[in-house]
Regions:
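Structural signature of hydrophobic alpha-helical transmembrane segments
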Residues: 41-54, 76, 101-109
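Cytoplasmic-side transmembrane-helix entry/capping segments in multi-pass membrane proteins
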Residues: 70-80
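Membrane-helix boundary elements
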Residues: 12-44
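Membrane-water interface at the C-terminal end of transmembrane alpha helices
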Residues: 110-128
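Membrane-helix boundary connector in multi-pass membrane proteins
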Residues: 85-105
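Canonical alpha-helical transmembrane segments
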Residues: 52-68
């Protein structure tokens, strides 16, 4: 019986390709971060972050399906929850002096922490 071939998962992994990384994760972070210098309304800032998190969450969920990247199974839903929370802040349902910065910070920290299981169990949930 042959050993599992990891190159199949790696070749499908958008996070391991500069173009995929740029499109799905770097670009939306830059767009979200640009709200701090564009002097937009609070609601616009929140909805831009909601869109950025939804974009990244979609990239993670699609990547999890493509290559079974472990942290994408975790960060995809976390980013979508952040998108929903940011939209709720933008619509005024969630309020507070630091509501948006809290949502953004917590979402980004959760997405970063989703890499920890890969350090324990490996990069991919299954080997193709």
């Amino acid at each position: 019986m042959a050993a599992p071939d990891c190159t199949t998962n790696e070749s499908r992994d958008w996070a391991r390709r500069p173009g995929g990384m740029l499109f799905w994760w770097v670009l939306p972070i830059l767009i979200g971060a640009s709200t701090y210098v564009l002097n937009l309304s609070f609601a616009a800032d929140a909805f831009i972050w909601a869109g950025a998190f939804a974009w990244m969450g979609t990239g993670c969920l699609l990547n999890a399906r493509r290559c079974a990247r472990l942290h994408c199974f975790i960060s995809g839903p976390a980013l979508w929850l952040g998108a929903i929370a940011a939209a709720l802040v933008g619509s005024g349902i969630i309020s507070g002096p630091h509501a948006l910065s809290n949502v953004v910070s917590i979402t980004i920290v959760l997405a970063m922490l989703s890499c920890v299981p890969e350090m324990i169990w490996g990069r991919y949930a299954r080997q193709d």
